[in-house]
Amino acid sequence: MSLFDLTGKNAVVMGGGGGIGRALAKGFAENGAKVLLADIAEEPLKAAAADIGADVPYKVTNATQEAEVEALVKFAVEKLGKITILLNAQGFNKKFDALDFDMDSFRAMLDANITSLMMTSKYFGRHFKENNYGKIISLSSVRGRIATKANGNAAYCATKGAVDMLTKSLAAEYGPFGVTVNAIGPNIVPTPAMVAIFEMRAKENNVTVDEYIKMQGAGIPLRRIGTAEDLVGTAVFLASAASDYMTGCTLYPDGGLTAIG
């Protein structure tokens, strides 16, 4: 069996209806894993499940709500059997002026980007402990490591920095019962939400969206922004036996941005 083969593995993908979660779930499935998708909205889940395979189960879940996460674990075990992989790809980015922001919106980002990860890691962590095995992979960002000159990113950067430290802390805590905890820190990825931001920024700069995307890629060593598919190899590695002795790490498939940041 290949080091990267996921045959016999069962993965729950949080944020499975989003651009990145969907791509990574598809990558898991293509490498042999059975997957179950969870997200806060049903329509994107339906579309993602149909894209991956007709038999892919899904469950609408608000990962900030404890009872819903607990129910998701039970549902996932009923559908797939023993869960071996948890991918935390939930969360969102919204611009906040650090001198003028709404606390309710800020708390919503904290809940989506970090509280939900604590919640899923708690309940799936218990399941992993019972089985003495598990892989937790969380979606961080280069913005958890390096700031950006653009205004409005303080809240997002703070939540992604928290993801990195949660990853390290859980790795230390969960390691004794055979669970690895790692994260992926991508650069800009053109998800539907990011495309909306590109359109806004392009208009502000009086350029086309394609021109704006090229401008963003110009400062990256590989001279382009990434895609969700660029993250699949890293995710499969972290979900597979190839990474069994790696824990507490954030890996950066970012085109080299953190090398110069």
What are these regions (language model features)?
Residues 89-94, 256:
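Conserved NAD(P)H cofactor-binding loop of Rossmann-fold oxidoreductase domains
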Residues 5-36:
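Canonical Rossmann dinucleotide-binding motif of NAD(H)/NADP(H)-dependent dehydrogenases/reductases
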Residues 121, 159, 167:
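Active-site helix of classical SDR
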Residues 97-98, 102-110, 216-217:
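Substrate-binding pocket helix/loop in short-chain dehydrogenase/reductase
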Residues 175, 180, 246-248:
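Short, small/polar-rich loop/turn modules that mediate ligand/substrate recognition or access, typified
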Residues 2-5, 224, 236, 247-261:
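Short C-terminal tail/terminal secondary-structure segment
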Residues 126, 172-173, 244:
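Alpha-helical segment proximal to the catalytic Tyr-Lys
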